[in-house]
From Swiss-Prot:
Subcellular locations according to the entry: Chromosome, Centromere, Kinetochore
Coiled coil: none
Residue positions, PTM Phosphoserine: S80, S83, S84, S114, S214, S248
BCNT-C domain segment(s): 216-297
InterPro entries: BCNT-C (IPR011421), Swc5/CFDP1/2 (IPR027124)
Pfam families for this protein: BCNT
Protein name: Craniofacial development protein 1
Length: 297
C-alpha cells in the first residue's frame, strides 16, 4: 500500500509538470494563451510606470490593470474629511464634558457651603476683627515688656544732700562742701552730729537765768563748751588739703570728665596700676588655695 501511494504521488507531480505537445492544442486554446500573455505584459508595464511616477513625486493618475484610480482618491478624501469632522465632534464633546464637570463641582461646593452655614456655629466676630484684636494685644504686651525693661535698666534716682564739714589746717578753718546721697553713711553721720550740736548751742542762752552766786561755774561751763566746739574741728593733713585743692580746681576749670576719660584709656597710669593690683590679688588667691589644698589630709 505504501509503495502504491508513493507511486500515485509521483504520478500526480508528473501530471502537473506535464506539457502536451503542440499538435494537441486547438486554435481557440492558442488564442486564449496569447491574450493572457498580452494582459500580463501590460500589467507589468503599468506597474513599472507607477513606480517611476511615485519616485518623481508627481501627483498623477495611478493606473492599475489599465484602470484609473480617481474614484479611490475621492474615497480617500471623503474618508479624511469624515475623520476630521469626527475629531472635531470628539473635541466638542470633550469640552462639553469638562464644562459639565465644572458645573457639577460648583454645585457641590455651593451645597457644602450651605451645609456648613446651616450646621456650623456662626462666628459673631469676623476674622478680620479677630486678627486686629490679636495684633493689638501683642502690641500692648510688647510695649509693657519694653516699659518694664526700661524701668529695670534705669536705676532709681536717689536724692542728693549737700554736706559741709569744717577742718582745721595749720590754724586755719577750712570748709568742705560735698554732694552725697541721702542714704550714704556720710550723710547719716552728718545729720547725727547736727542733732547733737543743737542742744549744746542752746545751753549758753539759758546760762544768764542762773543765780548770781554761780559766776565761777558759769565761766567754767562756757570754757568747756567752747573747748568742745573747738575740739570737734578735725585736723586736715597736707595730702588731704592738696587733694581738696585739686578737686576744687577741676570743678572750676571743668576738666573732670576729660581727666576721667584719659585715665580710663590704655595709657592711663591709674588704669595700669589698678590692673596690676588685680593681677597681684588674683595670684595671691591662687597661691592661698594651693596651700590650703595641700594642708588638708
Amino acid at each position: 500500500m505504501e509503495e502504491f501511494d508513493s507511486e500515485d504521488f509521483s504520478t500526480s507531480e508528473e501530471d502537473e509538470d506535464y506539457v502536451p505537445s503542440g499538435g494537441e492544442y486547438s486554435e481557440d486554446d492558442v488564442n486564449e494563451l496569447v491574450k493572457e500573455d498580452e494582459v500580463d505584459g501590460e500589467e507589468q508595464t503599468q506597474k513599472t510606470k507607477g513606480k517611476k511616477r511615485k519616485a518623481q513625486s508627481i501627483p498623477a493618475r495611478k493606473r492599475k490593470q489599465g484602470l484609473s484610480l480617481e474614484e479611490e482618491e475621492e474615497d480617500a478624501n471623503e474618508e479624511s474629511g469624515g475623520s476630521s469632522s469626527e475629531e472635531e465632534d470628539a473635541a466638542a464633546e470633550q469640552e462639553k464634558g469638562i464644562g459639565a464637570e465644572d458645573a457639577r463641582k460648583k454645585k457641590e461646593d455651593e451645597l457644602w457651603a450651605s451645609f456648613l452655614n446651616d450646621v456650623g456655629p456662626k462666628s459673631k466676630v469676623p476674622p478680620s476683627t479677630q486678627v486686629k484684636r490679636e495684633e493689638e494685644t501683642e502690641e500692648t504686651g510688647s510695649s509693657k515688656l519694653l516699659v518694664k525693661a526700661e524701668e529695670l535698666e534705669k536705676p532709681k534716682e536717689t536724692e542728693k544732700v549737700k554736706i559741709t564739714k569744717v577742718f582745721d589746717f595749720a590754724g586755719e578753718e577750712v570748709r568742705v562742701t560735698k554732694e552725697v546721697d541721702a542714704t550714704s553713711k556720710e550723710a547719716k553721720s552728718f545729720f547725727k552730729q547736727n542733732e547733737k550740736e543743737k542742744p549744746q548751742t542752746n545751753v549758753p542762752a539759758a546760762l544768764p537765768s542762773l543765780p548770781a552766786g554761780s559766776g565761777l561755774k558759769r565761766s567754767s561751763g562756757m570754757s568747756n563748751l567752747l573747748g568742745k566746739i573747738g575740739a570737734k574741728k578735725q585736723k586736715m593733713s597736707t595730702l588731704e588739703k592738696s587733694k581738696l585743692d585739686w578737686e576744687s580746681f577741676k570743678e572750676e576749670e571743668g576738666i573732670g570728665e576729660e581727666l576721667a576719660i584719659h585715665n580710663r584709656g590704655k595709657e592711663g597710669y591709674i588704669e595700669r596700676k589698678a590692673f596690676l593690683d588685680r593681677v597681684d590679688h588674683r595670684q595671691f588667691e591662687i597661691e592661698r588655695d594651693l596651700r590650703l589644698s595641700k594642708m588638708k589630709p
